[in-house]
Amino acid sequence: MSVWNYVVTAHKPTSVTHSCVGNFTGPNQLNLIVAKCTRIEIHLLTPQGLQPMIDVPIYGRIATLELFRPHNETQDFLFIATERYKFCVLQWDGEKSELLTRAMGDVSDRIGRPTDNGQIGIIDPDCRLIGLHLYDGLFKVIPFDNKGQLKEAFNIRLEELQVLDIKFLYGCVKPTIVVLYQDNKDARHVKTYEVALKDKDFVEGPWSQNNLDNGAGLLIPVPAPLGGVIIIGEETIVYCNANSTFRAIPIKQSIIRAYGRVDPDGSRYLLGDNAGILHLLVLTHERERVTGLKIEYLGETSIASSISYLDNGVVYVGSRFGDSQLVKLNLQADPNGSYVEVLERYVNLGPIVDFCVVDLDRQGQGQVVTCSGAFKDGSLRVVRNGIGINEQASVELQGIKGLWSLKSSFNDPYDMYLVVSFISETRFLAMNMEDELEETEIEGFDAQTQTLFCQNAINDLLIQVTANSVRLVSCTSRELVDQWNAPEGFSVNVASANASQVLLATGGGHLVYLEIKDSKLVEVKHIQLEHEISCVDLNPIGENPQYSSLAAVGMWTDISVRILSLPDLELIRKENLGGEIVPRSVLLCTLEGVSYLLCALGDGHLFSFLLNASTGELTDRKKVSLGTQPISLRTFSSKGTTHVFASSDRPTVIYSSNKKLLYSNVNLKEVNHMCPFNTAAIPDSLAIAKEGELSIGTIDDIQKLHIRTIPLNEQARRICHQEQSRTLAFCSFKHNQTSIEESETHFVRLLDHQTFEFLSIYQLDQYEHGCSIISCSFSDDNNVYYCVGTAYVLPEENEPSKGRILVFAVEDGRLQLIVEKETKGAVYSLNAFNGKLLAAINQKIQLYKWMLREDGSHELQSECGHHGHILALYTQTRGDFIVVGDLMKSISLLVYKHEESAIEELARDYNANWMSAVEMLDDEIYIGAENNYNIFTVRKNSDAATDEERGRLEVVGEYHLGEFVNRLRHGSLVMRLPDSEMGQIPTVIFGTINGVIGIIASLPHEQYVFLEKLQSTLVKFIKGVGNLSHEQWRSFHNDKKTSEARNFLDGDLIESFLDLSRNKMEEVAKGMGVPVEELSKRVEELTRLH
C-alpha cells in the first residue's frame, strides 16, 4: 500500500523571487540576500566575487524580503513576510554564524479578502513602521518603538480597493505612503497618505496625480534630497513630487517589473522589462530639483524578477523565467552594442512545466528532461544524479592490482607515467608525442613484481615500494639510486609515501618509517604493534606539502585506526571502530581548509573524523555506507579543488561544500582502482581500473545533480521520450513581438535523445496550441507513434471548441503525419490505453481505437466516452482504471468495461480541489497536487459495505508542499540497486514552478512509523528560521480549511539530521532510543532515494 509517503527535495528551488543588498553580516560586509520562494541565501561580496555564506529553508512562501536598519544599529536587519501571513525579523549572529530571530508574529485577519495583486510589504525609510497591504481595503501598520522593537499591529482602512503598488516616500516629517491604484473605470492614479500613528489613521497626503498611463504598475520612491516618486508605465515613465514637479518621457512599449537603485542618492536606476532588456533610467537634477528623465539601453539579460546593484558596476539579476546572472556593466559597448557582460550564470530549472524520465544507459537510473523557463529564456534541461566520467581512451587489461601516476620531474605540472601493478609484475605506460599511451620502461624499477606504492619524491627521485624493497630511482637517468630491503623472512604488506617520507608495514605488526635524506633512504624508526597492520597513510595535511607530522594506521584484530606522530611513531590517538570488518584504506586529507581522517572498511562502510592537524585529535565521528565491497581511497584534483575518490562496487566522490562532507555517486558500475592522471593532453583526467579494463577519462563538475541546458529561445510545454526511435518530441511556442499585435507560433519538435540535436519540426496551424504528447503503439500494429493533442485558442472564445489529435511516425529522423482527427475541444491529456488512445477533451473522456482502412491507411475511430467533468485536465491509467484530475472537482476514478465497451465512474473525491497534476501510486492509492500548493492522496474503497462508500475516494494523506506541482511521474533519479532495501521502494518524481525536482517515496509501514517519530523529535531540535512553525507550514491549507499533515513525512527535515553536530545527533538518538550510528545509517539510506 502506498499510503505512507516520504517527500524529499532532489533539486532545491532555483527561481529567484526577491533579492536585496545591504550590510547584514557585519557593518563593513556587503551582502546579497536572495529569496527563492521557500529558501533564502546569504552571499558575501568579496574581491573574488560572491561567496555563499548560508542557504536555509523558510517555513513559508516568501512574499516580502526587505533589509532595514533600526536606530542605533551598525548593521541591517532582515524583514520577511510569508504568503500565509507570518512575519519575522532576523539578525545575523557573527560569533555563531547563524540567524537570530528578533521578532516574529502573525498578521492575518479573520475577515478580509486577500488582495488579487499579491501582498505588499514595505518599511518606512526612517524606521518608524512596517506597512503591509494583505487584504483589499486594509493597510496594516506595525510600528517601531524608539528602541527599534516592534509594537502591536493595527489596521487602517484604505478606500482604494484595486491597489497596484504602495511605497513609503523618503524625507517626510511624518511617515507617508504613495498608493498606485485603479478605479472602477480602469483608470490609474496615485495618491499620498500620511500615517498618523497616534490616531491609527490616514491623513490625506500632500499630493496626488490622476490619469496615469493605463499600464502604470510600479512605483520607485526617490531618496532625499530629491524625494518624490517615479511611476513606471508601459508607454511612459513619470516623475512627480510634493512640489508639483512633473516630468515624463515616452518609452518603447514594455512591461517593467524589476528595478535596482544604482546610487544612494537615487539619480540612476536599472530597469528590467519582460523581454529581458536592461535599461538605465537617469534623473537629471540641479540644486536638489529633478529637471528631466533620460533612459538608455544597456543590453540583454535573463528576464529579471529582481535587480540588485552590488558595487563597481556589478549587478545581480534574479530571474524566475531563466538563469539568474551576475553581470558587469561596461563603459564601452561590445560589437553588438551591449554594455552588459555576463560574469556568472546561476542555473534555474523553473518554471518546470513538464518533464519526462529517460533511462539512456539502461542502468535503471533516470535522467529527467524538463521543459524549463519561459518566453525567450525557455530551455530543455537534462538533469541526472551523480558524477559522470567522460571516457577519452580505454584498453583491455585483466587483473589490475593498483594504479599510480608519476611526473617526469618533481616540479613538472603534468603527469608523464602511469604505473600499473599486477599480481606478479608491474607495467609502465607513458604519453608519447602523439598523446597516446604506450608501454615504456623505468630501468631502476623492479618490473618483475607487484608494486605496492609509487610516488614522486624530492631531488627529482621516484619511489617504488614492493613486497621486498623500497627503491629510489632518478627521474632523469631512470637508474636505481638507493634501495632499502625488507628484513630476512619478512615482506612488506602495505605502504604509503609522500615526497620525503615512506611508511611501510611488514608481517608481525612491524611498522617501519624511512626518510629521504641526500637522495638516500634512511630508516628513522621501527616499532612493533600488537596486531597486524591493514593499511597506512601519511598524506601531508599540515603547512608543509612535502612532509607529514602525522601518520594514520589501520589495524586487524582490534579493528582500530591509530594516529601516530612522526618521526617517533608515538601513539597520539586510538579509535576503535567496532564490529568485525577490517579497515582497508585510510586517508589523511584537507578539503576546503578542513582536515579529515577517512577510514574505509572491507564491507563498503566509511568512517569520517574531523582531524586537528597540529594535535592529531579526532572528533565528530560519522559513519556512512557507500557500497558492499572493500573501498580504496585516493585524493584527486578538479578545477583546482581537492576531492576524494572512493573506489568500490559503488564508486563515490567525497567532496566538501560549505565545510560539510557530501557524497556523490559516480556513474560507473564498479571501480577497483583510481588514480589522478593529469596530462598536458587531457588535464585533470583520471585513470580508472574496472574489471578487465583500464580507461582514462575526465570528470564532470563535482556536484550531486548535473544539469545540461539546451537553450530553445522559446517555451517548451509538453515533452515525451520514444526509446524505439531514440528521440524526444516536445510541443513548444514562440512569442512573435514583431507586429503591434502579439502572436504565438506553436510547433512540435523532434530531438535526438543522446546528442539533443534538432531533427525535425512540424508547425501547428494559426491559433493552434500543443496541449499534450505521448508515445504509444496500437493493437495489431507494430509501429510506435507520437500522438499530439491540440486546441484552437481563438481570441473570441472562453474555452476552445475545437482541437486535433495528430499521429506522427518517426521515419528517417523526421516527423511524418500519419493520421489527424478533429475534436470538439482542447485535448488536454492523452494516454495509451490497452492498445487504444484515451483522450481528455474539455469536459469529456473519449476513447479512440486504431482502425485499418481498406486502402491500407489508418484512422482513429471514437469508441466510447464519459461526461461529467468541469474540465478534465489530467488523466492517468492502470489496467482498465482511469484517474482524472479536474480543473475544480478534484480526483475521480473511472473504469472501462470491455463487454459493454463503455467508460463508467466508479468513485470520486467530493472535495473541491483545483488540480494541477495526478498520478496513480498503485492500484488503490492515487496522488494529486492542487493550486494551493498542497498534495494529497486518496484511496479506492472497493471493500466498503455500501454503494455510497464505494463511490467515494477517501482522502488518506494530506501535506502542504509549498510548491505548485505541474507534473507527477513514476521514476527514479538514482540507480535502483536490487540488493539494497531502498531499491524496493517505489518513487514518483515531481516538478514545480520554482524549479524544484522532488521525490515522493512510498514506505513500508514500520519504517514510516519510525521516521514519523524521528520527525517529531527533530522538530524540537531544529527550529525554523524566524521561529516559524514546521507543523503549521506543513498543514494542508486552502480557502476552506487547514488540517494537520498526515501520512506524509518531510524528508528535507529528516535528512537535515545529518547536518547536526555530533552532540545534537546523540541527543536526538537518545530521544529515539536508538544508537546514533544506526540512526545515521537509516537516514543515510534515505538520501539514496535521490
From Swiss-Prot:
Expression by tissue, per the entry, reads: Expressed in proliferating tissues. Highly expressed in shoot apical meristem (SAM). Expressed in roots, young leaves, flag leaves, and panicles. Not detected in mature leaves.
Q: List where in the cell it is found.
A: Nucleus
GO cellular component assignments: nucleus
Q: Which is a GO BP term held by this UniProt record? A: DNA repair
Looking up Pfam families in the UniProt record yields: Beta-prop_RSE1_1st, Beta-prop_RSE1_2nd, CPSF_A
Alphabetized, the UniProt keywords read: DNA damage, DNA repair, DNA-binding, Nucleus, Ubl conjugation pathway
The protein's predominant localisation is nucleus
Coiled-coil annotated residue ranges, if any: none
Q: Which GO terms describe its molecular function?
A: damaged DNA binding
Ranges that cross the membrane: none
Q: Which family does it belong to?
A: Belongs to the DDB1 family.
Q: Describe its partners and assembly state.
A: Component of the UV-DDB complex, which is composed of DDB1 and DDB2.
Q: PANTHER family in the record, alphabetically?
A: DNA REPAIR/RNA PROCESSING CPSF FAMILY (PTHR10644)
State what this protein does.
Required for DNA repair. Binds to DDB2 to form the UV-damaged DNA-binding protein complex (the UV-DDB complex). The UV-DDB complex may recognize UV-induced DNA damage and recruit proteins of the nucleotide excision repair pathway (the NER pathway) to initiate DNA repair. May function as the substrate recognition module for a DCX (DDB1-CUL4-X-box) E3 ubiquitin-protein ligase complex.
Q: What is the protein name stated in its UniProt record?
A: DNA damage-binding protein 1
| Gene, per the UniProt record | DBB1
